[in-house]
């Protein structure tokens, strides 16, 4: 039996400034994932530090916070069968040089000097997805609606 999950995706500054928002969203929709919440925001340092809390003691933490707060980002909640795992596979390896062609990071990720511009953040577990979604979205900002097949064939218009 399939398990419907929700996961958080952040389209990061390097993707925003390169005009990749539509391409990235399109890939998720074509895969059959449903967008149940989405907005463009400018993440402040406080929110960024909460989001990346697990990296606080790592040497790249300050650079990561500087990077994610540099421009607006698009945050979205995707829903679907095994959404966390599906999105992680679509994203590819964290480091773009290790990401397979055909994945989002493999196709669009860059390494510029010492910086890794890996295009998107994707929750790494159901537990982190729940925590991250609650950081960026209020419950009333997430929507339930039928997909086309349900709308046209099962429930009617």
Curated annotation (Swiss-Prot):
GO molecular function, one term: ATP binding
Keyword Protein biosynthesis: no
EC number, as in UniProt: 2.7.4.6
Assigned keywords, A-Z: ATP-binding, Cytoplasm, Kinase, Magnesium, Metal-binding, Nucleotide metabolism, Nucleotide-binding, Phosphoprotein, Transferase
Binding residues for ATP: 12, 60, 88, 94, 105
Keyword Lipoprotein tagged: no
Reaction(s) catalysed (UniProt annotation): a 2'-deoxyribonucleoside 5'-diphosphate + ATP = a 2'-deoxyribonucleoside 5'-triphosphate + ADP; a ribonucleoside 5'-diphosphate + ATP = a ribonucleoside 5'-triphosphate + ADP
Task performed by this protein: Major role in the synthesis of nucleoside triphosphates other than ATP. The ATP gamma phosphate is transferred to the NDP beta phosphate via a ping-pong mechanism, using a phosphorylated active-site intermediate.
PROSITE patterns with a match to the protein in the record: NDPK (PS00469), NDPK_LIKE (PS51374)
Localization, UniProt: Cytoplasm
UniProt xrefs under SMART domains: NDK
Cellular component terms (Gene Ontology): cytoplasm
Family: Belongs to the NDK family.
Record-level GO BP terms: CTP biosynthetic process; GTP biosynthetic process; UTP biosynthetic process
List of catalytic residues: 121 (pros-phosphohistidine intermediate)
Protein's name according to its UniProt entry: Nucleoside diphosphate kinase
Cofactor: Mg(2+)
Pfam families (alphabetical): NDK
